[in-house]
Amino acid sequence: MSSSRKQARLDAKTNIESLSVQPYPNSNKVYIEGSRPDIRVPMREISLADSLVGGTKESPIFEPNEPIQVYDTSGVYTDPSYDIDVYKGLPKLRQEWIEERNDTELLDGVSSVYSQERLADETLDELRYGNLPTIRRAKQGQCVTQLHYARQGIITPEMEYIAIRENMGRQKFADEQLNHQHPGHSFGANLPKEITPEFVRREVAEGRAIIPSNINHPEAEPMIIGRNFLIKVNANIGNSSVSSSIEEEVEKLVWSTRWGGDTVMDLSTGRNIHETREWILRNSPVPIGTVPMYQALEKVNGVAENLNWEVMRDTLIEQAEQGVDYFTIHAGLLLRYVPMTAKRVTGIVSRGGSIIAKWCLAHHQESFLYTHFREICEICAKYDVALSLGDGLRPGSVADANDEAQFAELRTLGELTKVAWEYDVQVIIEGPGHVPMHMIKENMDEQLKHCHEAPFYTLGPLTTDIAPGYDHITSGIGAAMIGWYGCAMLCYVTPKEHLGLPNKDDVKTGLITYKLAAHAGDLAKGHPGAQIRDNALSKARFEFRWEDQFNLSLDPITAREYHDETLPQESGKVAHFCSMCGPKFCSMKISQEVREYAKDSEQVALDQAIEIKMIDDPLEGMRQKSEEFKASGSELYHPVVEAE
């Protein structure tokens, strides 16, 4: 191992061991209690400064601003009252809910042959997570999926938790300015003014939403993926044969949840996949997804032709018993679709898709994922693992977008969705890829038509191919658009896409870009309450409350750093201008002066005031401002007077 790799592992290990609670600036962790004491839904509450609304310098009049509550994925990592210990894992939030349903049983040991072999290997003791939980499985004849409960008319604690979480405490806002929202265009989505537990149950029962919640991952805070809810963002992490360690992956997990990752996919392809995944699951407050095919391939030494159902089945059970919440399964790639990719510019770009295509051609038969799909569903139903039906034939270039191969597979995914629903297994559908802007809506329309409104989950899509190093931007454009059209979850893309494995900083950049895209989509489709945070930040901006601007942003740290590059002094935090326009040309300062001018001139309406202000005798205006400046003591800067 190179010295730089050793140092990276050491740094990550140090960060994990010394992990301290680091909440966002001026934010508090708050919990909203549901109908029972153990339903405590976390929110991040951002405290705001008061607004100066009148008075004099000696006797200013202030008006308080309500704190803003925002969706929080960071788990207990930002709760000052919790003592973090990654070696013990997170609290088992859902364990009591699972137990009281009385439809599961505890196993004496692991069922997977591979898991048994790993446990027996003493050389792995130092790598292994030391506090392994007892495995849980559905009792004989029972189904333990949230879809099953929803279809039975049962509102689970998870559903109530989600309803509270999706509303983000917006019911408490009385401020008309904060509540103002433009009507959106939802393209047929059903967006109620308030999310109720019954609405959550109904959406899950109809297959329009999923709650990824493996019974062996009780640490995960319940969340929902669906067209009629807030758009979610997935972050990918994972080691490879040439890069990254267990320590670094756990660090990236915690980092991902801090910056808004609603789910995390572990796409590890290197050594010690099993052990890495255990560490991630025990320390993850969000659902974890995987592509089981990657690990199955490792078990046959990377030779795709040697894959078989027995290896795959054992891998599915292994991961389900560890607590993986959703599997990406490329079961819709059929043998007859492979020739359709021959004329493509970039062929088959999905790793899972290329593995299946190679296997199909080598054996000249349909893949074992397709022929054993019902058995896959039976396994998932025992643990409540959701299926993310993979798009192995997604386009890898804009030239290949929306071709016959892509849409043929999509129609098969729709057929498989109905099969999974027969077993009460939750389903989402994966989508592209690389699609130019004018062709994106067709993807959403086709998915809704052929996949029966099961939630759509897309990688971008990237809207152009010319920007390696900036593909978080090329894809963020497409992500915002398809989110508006109805996509339920967006898989983030980092600046390293097509270039290398992302590091910690890349993960943050990708997540911030995609949280922005998701929020833009929520605004466009008119999700209730989506505009509250925008309104609060805009009000802070107009009132030159700089700290509130930073703290309300998606990335307060970067916002503050950019401001301080040119105005680092504390006086810059109270100045009524920034370095972009300077004190003389700040549009918002001028606008405030226009308002004051109109207020002082009782006979003049606001629109007239603007005209007078701009074209009236400029010399008289300058004389007035000169007198005001002298009267104020000829002070260039006037700090904001703090409320007592």
UniProtKB/Swiss-Prot annotation:
Copy out the cofactor comment. Binds 1 [4Fe-4S] cluster per subunit. The cluster is coordinated with 3 cysteines and an exchangeable S-adenosyl-L-methionine.
GO BP terms, alphabetized: thiamine biosynthetic process; thiamine diphosphate biosynthetic process
Q: Which residues bind substrate?
A: N236, M265, Y294, H330, S350, R351, G352, D391, G392, L393, R394, E430, Y457
- Describe its function: Catalyzes the synthesis of the hydroxymethylpyrimidine phosphate (HMP-P) moiety of thiamine from aminoimidazole ribotide (AIR) in a radical S-adenosyl-L-methionine (SAM)-dependent reaction.
Name the PANTHER family on file. PHOSPHOMETHYLPYRIMIDINE SYNTHASE, CHLOROPLASTIC (PTHR30557:SF1), THIAMINE BIOSYNTHESIS PROTEIN THIC (PTHR30557)
InterPro entries referenced in this protein's UniProt entry, alphabetically: ThiC, ThiC-associated_dom, ThiC/Bza_core_dom, ThiC/BzaA/B
What protein family is recorded? Belongs to the ThiC family.
* Keyword terms, alphabetized: 4Fe-4S, Iron, Iron-sulfur, Lyase, Metal-binding, S-adenosyl-L-methionine, Thiamine biosynthesis, Zinc
Q: Which residues bind Zn(2+)?
A: H434, H498
Under the heading Gene3D superfamilies, the entry gives: 6.10.250.620, Radical SAM ThiC family, central domain
Tell whether Iron is among the UniProt keywords.
yes
Which NCBIfam families is this protein grouped with? Answer: PRK09284.1 (NF006763), PRK13352.1 (NF009895), thiC (TIGR00190)
Give the cofactors, semicolon-separated.
[4Fe-4S] cluster
| The gene coding this protein | thiC
**Reactions this protein catalyses:** 5-amino-1-(5-phospho-beta-D-ribosyl)imidazole + S-adenosyl-L-methionine = 4-amino-2-methyl-5-(phosphooxymethyl)pyrimidine + CO + 5'-deoxyadenosine + formate + L-methionine + 3 H(+)
Whose protein is this, by species? Answer: Aliivibrio fischeri (strain ATCC 700601 / ES114)
EC numbers for this chain: 4.1.99.17
According to UniProt, this protein's pathway is: Cofactor biosynthesis; thiamine diphosphate biosynthesis
List the GO cellular component terms. Answer: cytosol
Assembly and partners are described as: Homodimer.
What Pfam families has UniProt attached to this entry? ThiC-associated, ThiC_Rad_SAM
Q: Which residues bind [4Fe-4S] cluster?
A: C578, C581, C586
Name it.
Phosphomethylpyrimidine synthase
Q: Name a GO molecular-function annotation.
A: carbon-carbon lyase activity
